[in-house]
């Protein structure tokens, strides 16, 4: 079933009779055809086993270059406050990924370097299990402030903390023996710096009397032949963690976890929900067909790679007892006798398993951790010389008691980090590599030498002396480059600016080929669309709210009457204040003055919405829109209250199982936490539910840096408030994919998996066991992709192009997604070069705004020699729907959406999902419904349609060439302009452009109205 098949692949990715020769491996990746590493069923995701063809090590390159820069800075005569590196990236999650990658990389270097240094310090050049952790700890040169939750502790508390640290080190050292668990960082054994031997194994293989008791093949073999076979068997068991050691015992691991939680701090302690891998058992038989054992079992049968070696005559050269027919029965007899001798000598231990099977583990006391005998670089083959040299250098640093690596720490600095934590990091970063000090009896924290930030650090943050800036990618525009590079080298000081250009990034390579365009490029003045109706309207709402003279407070609970739970209306005093006479007249007067300032921008061509009565309608309707702006908050509040009630009913149900009670308690606690966040009354504007920030997010007030109507993800808090309970916000079009089912979110050193949608149902009565979610339906035109909703679904022809709707895509289970909830998955490791992304099939559809019952759109054409080449349609304030159709690799392409348990909101097990898309925690839902998530918003759009149908590859090239040209001409960031194929990626008949940034820059308006603009593009 999983046998690799030879194929030939064309450049398009299609299987052909000609092309590049390759091997196709059905199902998930189970073993490597080159090095032989194998994976059992416990490792499901291929993302943890393989790196993509497009992966080029951006994160590793950034980490190594940053460490190198700091190493150089330490050798200079600069002050400690200048010995630091500020790193930039364009994405918040990339900043979190890079900080986590850096910290994990440093910890791995310290752990492996300390092991190597400890072995070198021994006269016998080897370590054994009884002294392993203590010797490694000695050479780590850690101080209590590095690892202890209470570094001031003395006596028995300090001793217990050290014991816990040794136990955690023991687990990490043994787990590091597992082959294939690290993709980018080969361990010491893989780079031939470490050899694991088995004490006295040669003497065991020379015991003729013992071997004569077994199969004649073993009795007549030479000691060298026995040694080669036995050593290979033990190596395979060891690399699969078939080791009997207290550090891999699941019961002891729980004790370590509990003690670590109380006594250690990260990164040396275990994180509270870190998945610990326990020992496995080796069974020398094939896996039974119906094997459902919960134990980790490694099968080394006669069909395995080891079995093939045992059956190979070359392994027994000159042996007269090599059987003519080496069948399974013969193999079983041979390996059973090998294991019998090894058990006699104490190398392995037998354990009875289910179904009468015997499992074997290596006794850790026989392991000898040694240096390799020698290394010839010319014959190194696939050995990574870089890592070999790196580990060797780190070991030398530790042997010299150098604590350079101990000082290195990276943190993220983005808008999604709490304000007080961000301020603390800025203060620490200003100190650079300054050590921790005791000032007047108080501990003054050490400096922070590395800060990876999003563009929030471009302006307005005091970071004191800075000489080195690192950019993880080429900035979008010369203006961004000038701002970021300008953070270094103040007051005429020299500075170093490093920019990483990814080989697979067209944007990076474009400027790598011509760096002058970026480094010395002209900085154009920023553009903004002052004729954007939503932009002007939100400012007029702010004027109206100011004229009411009412302070709203910092929490929405100060605005709504929570005593009236059914409707949650505005509080009576606020309702009376905004309806006060005189407010409307004052707001109208100020509004007229504002519009007069925009007179030149609000012409008929660019602002058709601006009618003589428009201002009056906005001001008159402001009280109603103010009330409606709290609809989403009310919906969220009711959803959390309903979730708490449902969970409480289960907790009070005597017939509920213990499992149901635990799950209900977890859901109750989560909903309670979310409700507290909704009611948050902290004065900081960092809360997404601060009244004014919330109104800005709803589009009622100007948002500036805050996304309008964002998609939100709940992030549960962690130990010691490293991460507080919070909501992360994303612009909705971006959030639909970033916060999709089972997607991974990177935040504060950890990954979080989206496990649940917060069902903001308007009718709370529908949140029951027979719930049916409020779904919508749509039909898309097969020719132009235009969306038909409501009564338009019954039309026979498209209202946009007139084509028949028959044969178009019909979606009957659309659900507007607004909030999701996550669970912590794991710590960010240095294995991750790029963020893990789930493969969704996303489509975009649109509907023009209506004006006098007709679509509001302007048409234009470009011709050459009297022949029309391109047709343009510009639609101001068109409604765009972004739809997540489901997994890109789903089995049934006509089945849309994802399965969800409507009681809990959890994304449930989906038969359509690829094998690696869901982890082991995904379960069958009890009341399951299939929904297709979507979001919508209004944007100015420009549709470009070639008059003559073009091949698919030409349309793809045209789309990206035009997008890149528009960005270059108008100096837009890549994320500011979106381009989508219509009707979909497989049938490209037209290209849809819309400005993805809030407010927009008015670029599409200029393209539609300026004859020369498109020619310049």
Placement of each model-derived feature along the sequence:
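Charged, low-complexity interaction segments
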Residues: 1-414, 419-425, 438-440, 444-445, ...
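Short, Lys/Arg- and Gly-enriched loop/turn segments at beta-strand edges
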Residues: 751-764
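Short peripheral tails and domain-boundary helices/loops at the edges of structured domains
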Residues: 761-793
């Amino acid at each position: 079933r999983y046998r690799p098949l030879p194929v030939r692949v064309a450049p398009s990715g299609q299987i052909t009779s000609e092309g590049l020769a390759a091997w196709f491996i059905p199902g998930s990746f189970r073993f490597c055809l080159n090095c032989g590493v194998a994976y059992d069923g416990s490792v499901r995701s291929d993302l943890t086993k393989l790196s993509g063809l497009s992966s080029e090590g951006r994160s590793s390159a950034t980490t190594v270059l940053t460490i190198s820069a700091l190493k150089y800075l330490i050798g200079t005569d600069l002050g400690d406050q200048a010995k630091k590196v500020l790193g930039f990236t364009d994405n918040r999650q990339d900043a979190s990924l890079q900080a986590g990658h850096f910290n994990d990389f440093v910890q791995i270097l310290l752990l492996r370097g300390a092991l190597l240094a400890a072995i070198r310090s021994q006269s016998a050049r080897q370590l054994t299990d009884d002294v392993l952790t203590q010797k490694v700890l000695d050479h780590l040169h850690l101080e209590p402030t590095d690892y202890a939750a209470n570094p001031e502790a003395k006596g028995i508390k300090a001793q217990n903390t050290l014991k816990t640290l040794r136990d955690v080190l023991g687990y990490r050292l043994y787990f590091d023996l597992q082959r294939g668990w690290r993709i980018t960082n080969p361990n010491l054994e893989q780079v031939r710096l470490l050899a694991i031997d088995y004490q006295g194994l040669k003497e065991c293989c020379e015991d003729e009397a013992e071997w004569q008791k077994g199969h004649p093949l073993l009795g007549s073999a030479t000691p060298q032949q026995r040694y080669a076979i036995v050593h290979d068997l033990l190596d395979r068991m060891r690399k699969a963690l078939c080791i009997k050691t207290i550090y891999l015992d699941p019961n002891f691991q729980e004790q370590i976890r509990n003690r670590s939680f109380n006594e250690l701090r990260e990164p040396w302690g275990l994180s509270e929900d870190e998945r610990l891998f326990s020992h496995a058992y080796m069974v020398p038989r094939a896996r039974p067909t119906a094997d459902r054992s919960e134990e980790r079992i490694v099968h080394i049968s006669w069909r395995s790679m080891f079995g093939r070696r045992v059956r190979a005559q070359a392994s027994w050269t000159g042996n007269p007892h090599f059987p003519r027919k080496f069948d399974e029965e013969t193999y079983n007899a041979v390996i059973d006798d090998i294991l019998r001798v090894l058990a006699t000598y104490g190398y392995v231990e037998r354990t009875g398993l289910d179904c009468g099977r015997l499992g074997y583990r290596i006794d850790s006391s026989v392991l000898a951790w040694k240096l390799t005998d020698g290394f010839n670089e010319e014959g190194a083959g696939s050995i990574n010389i870089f890592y070999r040299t790196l580990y060797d250098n780190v070991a030398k640093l530790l042997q010299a008691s150098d604590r350079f690596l101990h000082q290195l720490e990276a943190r993220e600095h983005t808008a999604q980090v709490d304000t007080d934590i961000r301020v603390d990091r800025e203060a620490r970063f200003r100190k650079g590599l300054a050590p921790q000090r005791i000032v007047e009896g108080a501990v003054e924290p050490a400096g922070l030498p590395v800060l990876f930030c999003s563009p929030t650090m471009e302006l307005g943050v005091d970071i004191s002396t800075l000489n080195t800036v690192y950019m993880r990618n080429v900035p979008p525009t010369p203006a961004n480059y000038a701002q970021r590079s300008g953070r270094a080298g103040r007051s005429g000081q020299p500075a170093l600016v490093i920019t990483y250009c990814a080989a697979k990034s067209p944007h990076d390579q474009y400027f790598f080929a011509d760096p002058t365009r970026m480094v010395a490029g002209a900085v154009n003045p920023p553009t903004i669309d002052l004729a954007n109706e939503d932009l002007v309207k939100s400012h007029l709402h702010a004027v109206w709210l100011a004229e009411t003279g009412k302070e709203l407070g910092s929490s929405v609970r100060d605005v709504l009457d929570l005593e009236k739970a059914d409707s949650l209306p505005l509080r009576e005093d606020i309702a009376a204040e905004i309806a006060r006479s005189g407010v409307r007249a004052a707001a109208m007067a100020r509004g007229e003055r504002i519009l007069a300032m925009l007179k030149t921008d609000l012409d008929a061509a660019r602002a058709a919405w601006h009618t003589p009565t428009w201002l009056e309608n906005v001001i008159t309707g402001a009280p109603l829109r103010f009330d409606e702006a709290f609809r989403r908050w009310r919906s969220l509040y009711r959803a959390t209250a309903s979730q708490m009630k449902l969970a409480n009913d289960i907790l009070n149900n005597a017939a509920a199982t213990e499992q149901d009670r635990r799950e209900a308690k977890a859901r109750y606690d989560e909903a309670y936490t979310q409700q507290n966040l909704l009611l948050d009354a902290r004065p900081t504007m960092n809360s997404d539910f601060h009244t004014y920030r919330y109104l800005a997010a709803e589009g009622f007030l100007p948002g500036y840096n805050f996304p309008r109507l964002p998609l939100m993800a709940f992030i549960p808090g962690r130990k010691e408030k490293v991460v507080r309970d919070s909501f992360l916000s994303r612009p909705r079009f971006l959030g639909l994919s970033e916060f999709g089912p089972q997607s991974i979110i990177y935040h504060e050193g950890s990954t979080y998996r989206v496990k649940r949608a917060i069902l903001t149902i308007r009718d709370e009565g529908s949140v029951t066991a027979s719930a049916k979610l409020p779904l919508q339906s749509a039909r898309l035109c097969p020719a132009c992709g235009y969306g038909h909703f409501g009564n338009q679904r019954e039309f026979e022809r498209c209202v946009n192009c007139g084509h028949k709707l028959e044969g178009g895509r019909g979606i009957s289970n659309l659900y507007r997604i607004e909030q999701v909830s996550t669970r912590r998955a794991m710590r960010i490791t240095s294995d991750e070069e790029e963020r893990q992304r789930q493969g969704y099939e996303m489509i975009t559809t649109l509907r023009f705004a209506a004006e006098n019952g007709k679509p509001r759109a302007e048409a234009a054409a470009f011709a050459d020699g009297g022949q029309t080449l391109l047709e343009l349609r510009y639609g101001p304030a068109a409604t765009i729907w972004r739809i997540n159709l489901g997994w890109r690799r789903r089995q049934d392409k006509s089945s849309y959406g994802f399965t969800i348990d409507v009681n809990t909101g959890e994304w449930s097990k989906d038969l359509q999902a690829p094998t690696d898309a869901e982890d082991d925690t995904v379960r069958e839902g009890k009341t399951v419904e299939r929904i297709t998530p979507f979001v919508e918003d209004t944007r100015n759009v420009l549709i470009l349609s070639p008059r003559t149908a073009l091949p698919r590859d030409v349309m793809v090239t045209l789309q990206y060439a035009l997008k890149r040209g528009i960005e270059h001409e108008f100096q837009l960031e890549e994320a500011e302009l979106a381009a989508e194929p219509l009707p979909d990626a497989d049938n490209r008949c037209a290209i849809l452009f819309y400005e993805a940034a809030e407010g927009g820059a008015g670029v599409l308006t200029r393209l539609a109205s300026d004859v020369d603009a498109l020619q310049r593009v």
